[in-house]
């Protein structure tokens, strides 16, 4: 298996936009909990951690970039704790880990940071206002039904001048698998059902963070491309990650001939010269701060001492000197 990471300068297309997810019930959260429990209980569960390890380390890098010590932090939807293993107790002194999967919490990775586990849904955080200096999240928020509400809760539990640093998959994720399955079903069954869960578009994320109350926003995109022997191996690894579709309108079973046709289409349309096939994961990274009086603020309109009209005088001033 070959994993490569590269930055995206632009987004060519977006599959689904969910800026209005508030009040929607897209995902079966009980099913997602069972999927995560099953995946984390596998004897070889670490075999499927490669994507979470990569993204967790990149979230940790952004924590170090802030260059401050956080007395108390929260990891929302921590899974097996793939962020904390890349952090030190000199940066994060104490950590709360939350997840809907008790098995994930029991089988979490070790860290030198003193940690406390709380089984909790990302959509219902059981913490008081102004509790945490830092909130983290990596590859769990794309399964939340009410993403605007979850971001508001994160904002609420942060202390003033606290920071939220997160990562979630974006709308271009697994486009190869999505297209291959749709084309195969159209050909074999005369129509198609959704097999890949809907993801948030990068164009919506900044607006969602702003609406939740965050300021000094940063949103950037990475693309992680993993090469597999074939489409069936892509689907096997998604299951091992606990990342199978849990949308209420998912199709439970694929016909065998449709699956074989999709695998052939996948290899024909996207296959590499060595016979492998790529699977693309678009990762959206976000940083948002809870407002505080000490933070820098934009100058008031009209308060500048220099006008753009003065630029024409620069040459004259230089010649006078």
From Swiss-Prot:
A molecular-function term among this protein's GO annotations: monooxygenase activity
Enzyme Commission no: 1.-.-.-, 2.1.1.-
Purpose of the protein: Arginine hydroxylase that mediates hydroxylation of 'Arg-111' of NDUFS7 and is involved in the assembly of mitochondrial NADH:ubiquinone oxidoreductase complex (complex I, MT-ND1) at early stages. May also have methyltransferase activity.
Main location per the UniProt record: mitochondrion
Taxonomic source organism: Danio rerio
Taxonomic lineage of the native organism: Eukaryota, Metazoa, Chordata, Craniata, Vertebrata
Protein name (database record): Arginine-hydroxylase NDUFAF5, mitochondrial
One Gene Ontology cellular component: mitochondrial inner membrane
GO BP: any one term: mitochondrial respiratory chain complex I assembly
Family: Belongs to the methyltransferase superfamily.
């Amino acid at each position: 298996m070959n994993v490569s990471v590269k930055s995206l300068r632009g987004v060519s297309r977006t599959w689904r936009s969910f800026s209005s997810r508030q009040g929607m019930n897209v995902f079966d959260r009980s099913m997602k909990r069972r999927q995560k429990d099953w995946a984390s209980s596998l004897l070889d569960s670490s075999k499927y951690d490669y994507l979470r390890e990569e993204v967790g380390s990149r979230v940790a890098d952004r924590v170090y970039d802030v260059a401050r010590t956080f007395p108390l932090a929260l990891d929302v939807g921590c899974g097996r704790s793939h962020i904390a293993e890349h952090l030190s107790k000199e940066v994060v002194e104490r950590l709360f880990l939350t997840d809907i999967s008790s098995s994930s919490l029991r089988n979490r990775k070790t860290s030198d940071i003193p940690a406390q586990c709380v089984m909790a849904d990302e959509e219902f955080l059981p913490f008081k206002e102004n509790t945490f200096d830092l909130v983290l999240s990596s590859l769990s928020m794309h399964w939340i039904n009410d993403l605007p509400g979850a971001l508001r809760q994160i904002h609420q539990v942060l202390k003033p001048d606290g920071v939220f640093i997160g990562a979630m998959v974006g709308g271009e994720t697994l486009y190869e698998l999505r297209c291959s399955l749709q084309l195969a079903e159209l050909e074999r069954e005369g129509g198609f059902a959704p097999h890949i869960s809907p993801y948030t578009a990068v164009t919506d994320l900044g607006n969602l963070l702003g609406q939740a109350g965050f300021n000094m926003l940063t949103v950037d995109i990475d693309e992680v491309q993993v090469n597999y022997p074939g489409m069936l191996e892509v689907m096997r690894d998604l299951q091992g990650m606990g990342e199978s579709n849990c949308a209420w309108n998912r199709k439970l079973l694929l016909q065998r001939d449709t699956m074989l046709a999709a695998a052939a289409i996948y290899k024909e349309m996207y296959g590499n010269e060595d016979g492998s096939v790529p699977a693309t994961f678009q990762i959206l990274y976000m940083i948002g701060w809870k407002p505080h009086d000490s933070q820098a603020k934009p100058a008031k309109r009209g308060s500048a001492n220099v006008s753009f009209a003065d630029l024409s005088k620069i040459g004259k001033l230089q010649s006078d000197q």
